[in-house]
C-alpha cells in the first residue's frame, strides 16, 4: 500500500452531449453537429464513389439555436456526431426585469436560469400573452449544454 493520497475531481455523470452515427444513415429532418454546433438537417445529397475514395454525403443544416445555415461534406462510411436534442414544456410563471423567465417544472420546482427568446415574434407573443394574464406553456429545446425557448402555446385565461 502506498502512502500517497489520491484526489479525484467529481463532475457530471459523464453523459455525452453527442452520440456517433454513420454519415450515410443521417437523413433529412435528423440532427448533426457541424463546426461544433447542433443542427437540424434540411438537405442531404450523396455522391457516388469515385476512382479514389469513398462515397460522400453533403449535408446542409440549420443551427437549431441561431438559425444559421451550415454545410459539411463527410465520407458516407465515417461517423458523425449527432447531438442529444431534448424538448421540454414548462409553464410560464413570471418575466423578470433583467431578461430572464421563471418557469414551473413538472415536479413543482422553478427554473429561473433561462433568458427571454431572441426571436422578436416569439418575444412579442410571450410578453403580450403574459400581460393579458393568459396561462402560457413554453417549449424549451436543449442540446450540447445550451437551452433556448423555441415555441409557446396559450392554455387559456387564468
Swiss-Prot record:
Phenotype on disruption: No visible phenotype, but presence of extra root protoxylem cell files.
SUPFAM superfamilies: Nucleic acid-binding proteins, Translation proteins SH3-like domain
GO CC, one annotated term: cytosol
Modified residues (Hypusine): 51
Gene Ontology MF term list: ribosome binding; RNA binding; translation elongation factor activity; translation initiation factor activity
Inducing or repressing factors: Up-regulated at post-transcriptional level by iron deficiency.
PROSITE patterns attached to this UniProt entry: IF5A_HYPUSINE
Segments of skewed composition (Basic and acidic residues): 1-10
PTM annotation (Phosphoserine): residues: 2
InterPro entries: IF5A-like, IF5A-like_N, NA-bd_OB-fold, Rib_uL2_dom2, Trans_elong_IF5A_hypusine_site, Transl_elong_IF5A_C, Translation_prot_SH3-like_sf
Annotated function: Translation factor that promotes translation elongation and termination, particularly upon ribosome stalling at specific amino acid sequence contexts. Binds between the exit (E) and peptidyl (P) site of the ribosome and promotes rescue of stalled ribosome: specifically required for efficient translation of polyproline-containing peptides as well as other motifs that stall the ribosome. Acts as a ribosome quality control (RQC) cofactor by joining the RQC complex to facilitate peptidyl transfer during CAT tailing step.
Classification via NCBIfam families: eIF_5A
Family of the protein in this entry: Belongs to the eIF-5A family.
Name of protein: Eukaryotic translation initiation factor 5A-3
Species this protein is from: Arabidopsis thaliana
Gene from which the chain derives: ELF5A-3
